[in-house]
Amino acid sequence: MSVKYFEPEEIVEHNNSKDMYMVINGKVYDVSNFADDHPGGLDIMLDYAGQDATKAYQDIGHSIAADELLEEMYIGDLKPGTEERLKELKKPRSFDNDTPPLPLLIALIVLPAIAVIVFVKLNK
């Protein structure tokens, strides 16, 4: 079986809870289906989504069982010699398509508040 090599530009695109790649020790893992179940929580996974998470993974000291689980998510290798480019390409994490944008959230809060104020003033 031949190894698939990933360019950094492809890795950084997979940076949200529904579509998440991580690089650990030069290997690329699709952790999308595991992120919600991670014992440390989804937020820590999102902090490293689409990036090289080697240092964070090693610093925590994961168990053998965690290493075995990680291997099940292996999808290929980072193209050799592109490690620095991956660090440079770090993108801000993207928000899932089901997360409403901030202006919409503000409108949903402000407009009803204005409606209540107008209603109260008209009914005095």
Curated annotation (Swiss-Prot):
Membrane protein topology class: Single-pass membrane protein
Example of a GO MF term: electron transfer activity
Segments crossing the lipid bilayer: 100-120
Primary localisation category: endoplasmic reticulum
GO cellular component term, pick one: intracellular membrane-bounded organelle
Keyword annotations: Electron transport, Endoplasmic reticulum, Heme, Iron, Membrane, Metal-binding, Microsome, Transmembrane, Transmembrane helix, Transport
Domain Cytochrome b5 heme-binding: 3-79
An annotated GO BP: ergosterol biosynthetic process
Compartments in which it is found: Endoplasmic reticulum membrane; Microsome membrane
Residues annotated as binding heme: 38, 62
Function per UniProt: Membrane bound hemoprotein which function as an electron carrier for several membrane bound oxygenases.
Protein name: Probable cytochrome b5 1
Source organism of the structure: Schizosaccharomyces pombe (strain 972 / ATCC 24843)
Lineage: Eukaryota, Fungi, Dikarya, Ascomycota, Taphrinomycotina
